Amino acid sequence: MKKKTLLPLFLGIMVFLAGCDYSKPEKRSGFFYNTFVDPMKNVLDWLGNNLLNDNYGLAIIILVLVIRIILLPFMLSNYKNSHMMRQKMKVAKPEVEKIQEKVKRARTQEEKMAANQELMQVYKKYDMNPIKSMLGCLPMLIQLPIIMGLYFVLKDQLVDGLFKYPHFLWFDLGRPDIWITIIAGVLYFIQAYVSSKTMPDEQRQMGYMMMVISPIMIIWISLSSASALGLYWSVSAAFLVVQTHFANIYYEKVAKKEVQPFIEAYEREHNGGSNKKGKNTQVVSKKKKK
């Protein structure tokens, strides 16, 4: 359910980002602007003007990295919960599927409630929390207003320094640049690919769709926006690629280690009887030989 809601959410956000406009002074008001956009504008202006000697390209890079580092604990918690849930589900899947079949075959409300109660017992047995899994989108929702605040600062060029000192590397921060646009699109493709590698098979199609849709939307918006926006997206995507890659490696090991007792308990429960039977069969065959 969580994965199915991500695509409409992502598309809705992209439409919102493309449609909002704070470029005109009379539109610079309201809760979102005052809470998220204006503070980002002031921080970026202070970084570029006072700390970095009018180097606004470097100011954008530093601000994106600082925001991503601040949000890192939320993202790491999401990675950990996702890996734990996936590893536990591998063990619990046979039991869960049997009970889900009971729910489908239930003819009365009482039978359905009994099957659902049985399902909750399985979740409890393997220390699985479906509600916690459903809240996996929460870290993303927490970070969105902050990231979107910086997005609008760059999209609508609200910092005067971007006009006065626009040159950074090979491009003009105040104008569209095809190369930084391509870099942003490629990095978001890689980021979606890295994320999809750890998805279960039934959810992987969603990851493949994101691999196509997100770069197209990024390129489409960047081609008609200041290259400062492409720089922002490139740095953000590069950070996410590294973050996702190493977090997946680490938390997959952690999850497998923590789930091992459940696997051993499952094997004892389901293979214990057959092992005893096998031993008895061996004893009987030895007696016959004698």
UniProtKB/Swiss-Prot annotation:
Q: Where are the stretches annotated Disordered?
A: 270-290
GO cellular component assignments: plasma membrane
Q: Which InterPro entries match?
A: YidC/ALB3/OXA1/COX18 (IPR001708), YidC/Oxa/ALB_C (IPR028055), YidC/YidC1/YidC2_Firmicutes (IPR023060), YidC_ALB_C (IPR047196)
Q: Which positions anchor the lipid (S-diacylglycerol cysteine)? A: C20
Kindly give the PROSITE patterns that the UniProt entry links to this protein.
PROKAR_LIPOPROTEIN
This protein's membrane topology, according to the annotation, is:
Multi-pass membrane protein
Covalently lipidated residues (N-palmitoyl cysteine) read C20
What residue stretch is flagged as signal peptide? 1-19
The processes (GO biological process) annotated in the record are:
protein insertion into membrane; protein transport
Is Transmembrane given among the entry's keywords? yes
- What family classification does the UniProt entry report for this protein? Belongs to the OXA1/ALB3/YidC family. Type 2 subfamily.
Q: What is this protein called?
A: Membrane protein insertase YidC
